[in-house]
């Protein structure tokens, strides 16, 4: 039943079409030439689509419009269009065979395609890192900053703990510049003033060595990272890795006492008798002279 309806719809559509699609058209053909060729079939208008081609060379820019090798011819009614297709399809025009057919207008499918994946949402809400309620982050401090200077800076808010550290940052993400080190600090405060108000007040009014500083609420993840690094450094300093055990040196070879050797030589000179060996071990013996 569905196929019958579709066929009837297609048949009704083709009977109302008055435009003919012409392909394999010579590139040298003009709209005037093609209109004269179709004049006997009642063609009211002819259109040859072109594209604009721009080149750097000036000598090729005299006619930048290039035809696509196709054309559309408009007729007064469907009967004339079908007559032109029947008589002229396959005929030669300017040494090229033409191909004609009814031009069916394109219609988009109204039913959505369920197989097509939906594009991912680009504007996703970024998660904001959690900030601490009692710790601030001081950025781009002098390299030789001291604990006392930072305490004096936050003296109105009772500073408790201060961690001074250095980290590598990149100024530009698109160009791979070498990173540079910055000195920063995490300062834990004991105050009833909201941490945001403290940051605004210190950043606007306080200066460090004549320069303003950047103060923001510290991220909880950064505080945990710095504390873990400090803990690891203290552990390594307290329990250094054991040194490699050195191999024992070989025992020295036994040496014959000088007194025993001299005594044997004296006896040999007196009695002309070879002296007995010093011991039963492999000690070297001295012959009589």
Curated annotation (Swiss-Prot):
Domain named RRM: which ranges?
A: 18-105
The record's region (Disordered) falls at 235-289
**Record-linked Pfam families:** RRM_1 (PF00076)
User: What are the recorded GO MF terms, alphabetically?
Assistant: mRNA binding
Q: Where is the composition biased (Polar residues)?
A: 279-289
Q: Which segments show compositional bias classed as Pro residues?
A: 239-255
**Gene Ontology terms, cellular component aspect?**
cytoplasm; nucleus; prospore membrane; ribonucleoprotein complex
UniProt superkingdom = Eukaryota
What does the record note about the induction of this protein?
Answer: Specifically expressed during sporulation.
Which keywords does the record carry? RNA-binding, Transcription, Transcription regulation
Similarity-based family: Belongs to the RRT5 family.
Described purpose of this protein according to its UniProt entry = May be involved in the modulation of rDNA transcription.
**Miscellaneous note of the record:** Present with 51100 molecules/cell in log phase SD medium.
Name assigned to this protein: Regulator of rDNA transcription protein 5
